[in-house]
Amino acid sequence: MKLLAVRRLLRIQRVVIRYRLDDLILELPMLPWWLRLLGATLPWRWLPRRKLELTRGARLRLALQDLGPIFIKFGQILSTRRDLLPDDIANELAWLQDKVPPFPPELAVKRIEEQLGAKIEQVFARFEREPLASASVAQVHAARLKSGEEVVVKVIRPNLEPVIRSDIAWLFILARLAERVSSEARRLHPVEVVSDYEKTIVDELDLLREAANASQLRRNFEGSPLLYVPQVYWDWCRPKVLVMERIYGIPVTDLETLRDQRTDFKALAERGVEIFFTQVFRDSFFHADMHPGNIFVSTRAPWSPQYIAVDCGIVGSLTDEDQDYLARNLIAFFKRDYRKVAQLHIDSGWVPAETKVNDFEAAIRTVCEPIFEKPLKDISFGQVLLRLFQTARRFNMEIQPQLVLLQKTLLNIEGLGRQLYPELDLWATAQPFLERWMRERVSPKQLLRNFQQQVEQVPHLSQMARDTLERLSQPHAHNTPPPEWKGSRHDWLGRLVGAVLLVGAAEVGLGQQLEAWPAWVMLAGGVFLILRR
């Protein structure tokens, strides 16, 4: 392992020198003066250099490609963090292609047989040794099950884990070094960025997780004309092998073929937007890797086109609170109610509770008002979220991984939609959906469902209330809310009153099965104050 780490370090050094990435590093404004001076004395900086007619973004992209699959994937993920990167670098990194030569079919067969505990001929009536596709983490082969179904078999590359551990270890070293030497770097949380990447890549190595994600997404859109997700064949799925239904569709970027079959491009673009908002707000479970390589269009009914989604290795989800705040943020933003946008960020706990609303509102207005100089149909939803996140970061907004995934997915969907149909008015498509969803949140049916859920939490809330009151009664207790009660001081003080009411209800009525009417009143008031948003 140590030998591998040293070899990787030497490899990284060679690539840095070849593409003169040291020039880019020394140009960083966050670099302290003494480190800039030390960097200028590096031995290779005194040697003759060949002229590179490349932008800084192109040099970084080529360097990551030379460093191999793990760095390529890191660059792809980094390209989605436009709240951290300059636009020119983020745009260049978005061109990184996760395509590598396939590994020998003999190794694929061996790994499949090890995982399934059976010979390939015992499971498949036909197995194509030439892979359909090959990427940094896995490759895919076509096959037919003994029972006759046409399938694809995805298999993780052999001997990948040691390389991943070594590369991630070096990324952590670089991230910690950056945090140690620069306060500006600390603001960008490089260690958290690498941790997020580590979780993503580790999750992608577990194909059972991907199978479960695909099954959930398929169930959510069962019978839907919007989206089809291939069936998972669980009997033949293992941690390193995934067997799914083989689908036949047109790549969403193959505009010529889609045009030849008379696809309704306007409907196709609008359905992409509808799929996104349905996943986020109806299901709170969304495919977070919807780049063009993972999306196809069914050849059936081109006048009413249906998407096909594959590769569910990366998914995201939102809590009820995040859904609510996100919807209200978007609606408030498009109404130019910057005060409400600022207050919602504070109430949600996305920025510190002590943030001054007036200052935050002014910062949001300064960044976002120019966006509205464009016609509404030309405004990018993804850019709206991006600008909000960039502004909030200046006010110490903590990284919200689920929101980063959401923004990345929205940018993908939006870019794809406008490629299919340039006149796509995303707001006109999304606004009715968001407003309908907000109305349904307060419908009698939904309120009844919420009340039933709240009643189930009463025993837990009563205990939490007791714990909180006991904590606050301690002589040296800090006047801070429990971590479960994130939000503004006004919110948690209200919840504290709710805690007192709950304990009172427990004392007055719970012992007599709530026969005393005051217990009912205190119980209802306590539940409302604690659970309200």
Swiss-Prot record:
Keywords: ATP-binding, Cell inner membrane, Cell membrane, Kinase, Membrane, Nucleotide-binding, Transferase, Transmembrane, Transmembrane helix, Ubiquinone biosynthesis. CDD domains: UbiB. One of its GO terms (molecular function) is protein kinase activity. It is a multi-pass membrane protein. Pathway: Cofactor biosynthesis; ubiquinone biosynthesis [regulation]. GO terms for cellular component: plasma membrane. PANTHER family: CHAPERONE-ACTIVITY OF BC1 COMPLEX CABC1 -RELATED (PTHR10566), PROTEIN ACTIVITY OF BC1 COMPLEX KINASE 7, CHLOROPLASTIC (PTHR10566:SF113). It comes from the Bacteria. It is found in: Cell inner membrane. ATP binds at residues 132-140, 154. SUPFAM superfamilies: Protein kinase-like (PK-like). Its EC number is 2.7.-.-. Belongs to the ABC1 family. UbiB subfamily. The active site is at 289 (proton acceptor). Is probably a protein kinase regulator of UbiI activity which is involved in aerobic coenzyme Q (ubiquinone) biosynthesis. The chain crosses the membrane at residues 24-44, 510-530. One of its GO terms (biological process) is ubiquinone biosynthetic process. Residues 126-494 form the Protein kinase domain. This is Probable protein kinase UbiB. InterPro entries: ABC1_dom, Kinase-like_dom_sf, UbiB, UbiB_bact, UbiB_kinase.
